[in-house]
Curated annotation (Swiss-Prot):
Role: Catalyzes the hydrolysis of glutamine to glutamate and ammonia as part of the biosynthesis of pyridoxal 5'-phosphate. The resulting ammonia molecule is channeled to the active site of PdxS.
Species this protein is from: Plasmodium berghei
Taxonomic placement: Eukaryota, Sar, Alveolata, Apicomplexa, Aconoidasida
GO CC annotation: cytosol; glutaminase complex
Matching PANTHER family: PYRIDOXAL 5'-PHOSPHATE SYNTHASE SUBUNIT SNO (PTHR31559), PYRIDOXAL 5'-PHOSPHATE SYNTHASE SUBUNIT SNO1-RELATED (PTHR31559:SF0)
Quaternary structure, from the entry: In the presence of PdxS, forms a dodecamer of heterodimers. Only shows activity in the heterodimer.
Name of the molecule in the record: Pyridoxal 5'-phosphate synthase subunit Pdx2
Gene3D superfamilies: 3.40.50.880
Pfam families for the chain: SNO (PF01174)
Family to which this protein belongs: Belongs to the glutaminase PdxT/SNO family.
Keywords: Glutamine amidotransferase, Hydrolase, Lyase, Pyridoxal phosphate
Residues that bind L-glutamine: 52-54, 124, 156-157
Single GO biological process annotation from the record: pyridoxal phosphate biosynthetic process
Pathway(s) this gene product operates in, as recorded in its UniProt entry: Cofactor biosynthesis; pyridoxal 5'-phosphate biosynthesis
């Protein structure tokens, strides 16, 4: 049985929970590895950028003259391999990150803070501090039977997808919040990229990890047939 490899960026954040969720799928063809450098990245058929703190993750990518940052950009935009970002990872996949009043990312990185891949505009820490974290009930828009109904998802210092800038972006799930309104975008995908503002790796279900695995399988199959 041919193996496929999914990597989880393991620089900062709760990467171990993502690894555990993929292992729960009990797929004998799946190998899951920690990714800490561009050598690890070369092994991967798909990669997850976990939650954590987006500016810290970006700084970790800056080591060795931005070598991992540049390798990830090439992975996303040139090789077009599947990438999934959760929370901070979703921020880093956004084409435009709205500047917060306390941010210094524009001065430090210019236009090179995010990796891009999702044509969305996103605001960091939109819902407040750690104390303002909440669990939402997702309204699944995807017709894929992998997704269960009545899914709840934790939003921890979550970003807000302010704008979708391309009709190539597909909404996977939305949710409502008593203070912020209805139909808030929670999960999106565009071509090889997928983003969730919440943390499915902290919940018992594995449907988002299963969905990403299927995305990786499809990419491998399509690449061979091209």
């Amino acid at each position: 049985m041919e193996k496929l490899t999914i990597g989880v960026l393991s620089l900062q954040g709760n990467f171990q929970s993502h690894i555990n969720h993929f292992l729960q799928l009990q797929n004998p063809s799946l190998k899951v590895i920690e990714v800490r450098n561009k050598t690890n990245l070369r092994e991967c058929d798909g990669i997850v950028i976990p939650g954590g703190e987006s500016t810290t993750l970006r700084k970790c990518m800056s080591y060795d003259n931005d070598s991992l940052y540049n390798a990830l950009k090439n992975y996303i935009h040139v090789k077009k391999k599947p990438v999934w970002g959760t929370c901070a990872g979703c921020i880093l996949l956004s084409e435009k990150v709205e500047k917060n009043k306390d941010d210094n990312i524009e001065n430090e990185y210019g236009n090179d803070f995010s990796l891009g891949g999702l044509d969305i505009e996103i605001t960091r820490n939109y819902y407040g501090s750690q104390n303002d974290s909440f669990i939402c009930s997702l309204d699944i828009k995807s017709q894929d039977p992998i997704f269960k109904k009545n899914i709840r998802a934790p939003c921890i210092r979550a970003p807000f997808i302010k704008k979708i800038s391309s009709d190539k972006v597909v909404t996977i799930a939305t949710f409502s919040h008593e203070s912020f309104g209805k139909n808030i975008i929670g999960a999106v995908e565009q071509d090889n990229c997928m983003g969730t503002i919440f943390h499915p790796e902290l919940m018992p279900y594995t449907c988002f990890h299963d969905y990403f695995l299927e995305k990786v399988k499809k990419h491998i199959k399509d690449s061979r047939e091209a």
